[in-house]
Amino acid sequence: MPKPHQVQVIKDRETQLREQQEAESKRRTYRDVKEETRKKHKKAHFEASPTPEESTSDKISLPRKRYYRQRAHSNPFSDHRLEYPRSPDDMNWEKLFPGFYDEETKQMTSSVEIADVGCGYGGLLTKLAPEFPNSLILGMEIRVQVTQYVEDRIIALRNKHEDEDVNFQNIAVLRGNAMKFLPNFFRKGQLSKMFFCFPDPHFKQRKHKARIITNTLLSEYAYVLKEGGVVYTITDVEDLHNWMVKHLEEHPLFERLSKEWEEQDTCVSIMFNSTEEGQKVTRNKGSKWIACYRRLPNPEECV
């Protein structure tokens, strides 16, 4: 026969399990509703002005992060069953940036210039949007729930600000693995800026090959970056900062920008303060290490 304290432990476990099941049920219901909203609005062009009644009844609320639970990191070498184009020419950008699609010509009026690799919950995207209103900015995120959160966040922001100058039509997110498929999305020299904000440090030495900055990957980043384009990195892990600096310094197509340049660059300030991870580091009084590198001309072009 169980002792009284054992009975209490069993009850506590049952209560905890029941609460977890109830919480998961709420999350599932919430996400189902958001999924319907996402399907309805993610391809909307917002060309026809809604009636006052539609505007009032069809407002979309910002998503709540607690309903998008996800592990902090994801294994980039796993088979995530991701969708990706065979080449940049096969990519359908209209579904991500409907506001920049010309119905008459059936062509995009602009192409993606800025990429936030591992965009997390989209804090950097939303802050960059008003700074570069005519540039398309893409967030790439491998985690399912986090990607859906950012999708819902962008949909809500577009809905809320559709009649304003800053309407967030220039930002989007897709679920993708930049370590494997980056050249499938972007043409040679297409990007002007790439951000790597608080990437997974992969502390164990045997995991270092999974870090987002390696010699091989830097060559791919150099391929999609235009001459003079900038790689932005920030982390709260000094060892990872030193690792990224070492590999960028060793690569012949990147040159570090000065501290004076960093202090004057608007994107550095936004990157330092706007991401959710960065804000958490600030709250915990942690340190942030920044390094920015310019894409150099190819050697054969330096004649």
Swiss-Prot record:
Enzyme Commission number, as recorded: 2.1.1.33
Residues reported in the UniProt entry to bind S-adenosyl-L-methionine: 118, 141-142, 177-178, 197, 275-277
Catalytic activity as recorded in UniProt: guanosine(46) in tRNA + S-adenosyl-L-methionine = N(7)-methylguanosine(46) in tRNA + S-adenosyl-L-homocysteine
Cross-referenced InterPro entries: SAM-dependent_MTases_sf, Trm8_euk, tRNA_(Gua-N-7)_MeTrfase_Trmb
Pfam families named in the record: Methyltransf_4 (PF02390)
Protein name: tRNA (guanine-N(7)-)-methyltransferase
Subcellular location: Nucleus
Positions with biased composition (Basic and acidic residues): 10-38
One Gene Ontology term, aspect cellular component: nucleus
Function, in words: Catalyzes the formation of N(7)-methylguanine at position 46 (m7G46) in tRNA.
Top class in the EC scheme: transferase
Entry similarity comment: Belongs to the class I-like SAM-binding methyltransferase superfamily. TrmB family.
Source species of the chain: Scheffersomyces stipitis (strain ATCC 58785 / CBS 6054 / NBRC 10063 / NRRL Y-11545)
GO function terms (MF aspect): tRNA (guanine(46)-N7)-methyltransferase activity; tRNA binding
Catalytic site: 200
Region annotated Disordered, chain positions: 1-64
Keywords: Methyltransferase, Nucleus, RNA-binding, S-adenosyl-L-methionine, Transferase, tRNA processing, tRNA-binding
Record-linked HAMAP family: tRNA_methyltr_TrmB_euk
Pathway(s) of this molecule: tRNA modification; N(7)-methylguanine-tRNA biosynthesis
Oligomer status and interactors: Forms a complex with TRM82.
